[in-house]
Amino acid sequence: MRTVLIAGAFSLVVSLFGTPLYIRWLVRRGYGQFVRDDGPTSHHTKRGTPTMGGVVIILAALLAYGAAHLFTGALPTVSGLLVLLLMTGLGVVGFLDDFLKISNQRSLGLTAKAKLAGQGLVGIVFAVLALQFPAAGKDGTTPASTHISVLRDTPLDLAVFGAVGGTVLFVVWALIITSAVSNGVNLTDGLDGLATGATTMVLAAYVLICTFQSNQSCYSLTEVEARCYEVRDPRDLAVVAAAVMGACFGFLWWNASPAKIFMGDTGSLALGGALAGLAILSRTQILLVLLGGLFVLITLSVILQVGSFKLTGKRIFRMAPLQHHFELAGWGEVTIVIRFWIIAGLFVFLGLGVFYAEWVTGA
């Protein structure tokens, strides 16, 4: 537990005090946000605000993870490093997108195909590696399994299609999760502090979930219990979640309205990758849909808006994603953010309740 606390505290301090230094560096180089003319008029005042703040979040999390292990003498694990790899890899894709937007002074960076290709490449590397590195003394458990998981692995095993077929299907499944979550966080990042605060809540949930899994691990109990968790390295996954959570919390101080800096795609894709990696390796893939319910609602608003317009020529919302609909309805930005945070918090509490109830009841 000490490693978890150190990781969270260290990343918070680095992010809190490192962000203003990064802001000044960005301002000197003129790296400011480009705002579309067809967006909400209230956003025009945000033009020129420093962006690519995700760089601070990523660096703070990486430094905190390393420092926590250095201070406690604990060894990093493959599971923890894989989540950080996925987070950093998607962050690089987002950084390229942000940099092109700034350089070209337009709202489009990477093409949609290039962006998806980058996300896909990073996701494939993560998924393939996650099925490698069997642990000695843990029945050869790999960081990920080919089972579809809800609150833990279910009997639905993709390996039923053979070793090769199961691996291919798992990679596809992991890509779907990674792409959906990273793009969901990206769509949510439209108002000051919204995505940062919502993601912090989900990461806090994973600190609790992975810590609980560690205390009830099939590999640490002296007597194996029927409801133990066959998760590889759950304690280190909690360390990663704490490191990223602390980084987000420190960044939120500067990202809250009126934002002094935006995380950009660098941050939103990276945070989505961290959540996806934690869900896959902690065997809570479907639970993430509930924990990240706000991201799901916002993504659905875009899907419904696009689908309705293509089929009927009419829009369901005044503007999508959903937060912009309420902006055009006259809600203040801070009001929307706080209410959406409340919704995000309710989803997180509900998800944690379902997770704990499953363990208590054995259902």
Curated annotation (Swiss-Prot):
The lineage of its organism: Bacteria, Bacillati, Actinomycetota, Actinomycetes, Kineosporiales. Belongs to the glycosyltransferase 4 family. MraY subfamily. GO terms for cellular component: plasma membrane. This is Phospho-N-acetylmuramoyl-pentapeptide-transferase. Its EC number is 2.7.8.13. The keyword Transmembrane helix applies. Its main location: membrane. It is a multi-pass membrane protein. Catalyzes the initial step of the lipid cycle reactions in the biosynthesis of the cell wall peptidoglycan: transfers peptidoglycan precursor phospho-MurNAc-pentapeptide from UDP-MurNAc-pentapeptide onto the lipid carrier undecaprenyl phosphate, yielding undecaprenyl-pyrophosphoryl-MurNAc-pentapeptide, known as lipid I. It comes from Kineococcus radiotolerans (strain ATCC BAA-149 / DSM 14245 / SRS30216). It catalyses: UDP-N-acetyl-alpha-D-muramoyl-L-alanyl-gamma-D-glutamyl-meso-2,6-diaminopimeloyl-D-alanyl-D-alanine + di-trans,octa-cis-undecaprenyl phosphate = di-trans,octa-cis-undecaprenyl diphospho-N-acetyl-alpha-D-muramoyl-L-alanyl-D-glutamyl-meso-2,6-diaminopimeloyl-D-alanyl-D-alanine + UMP.
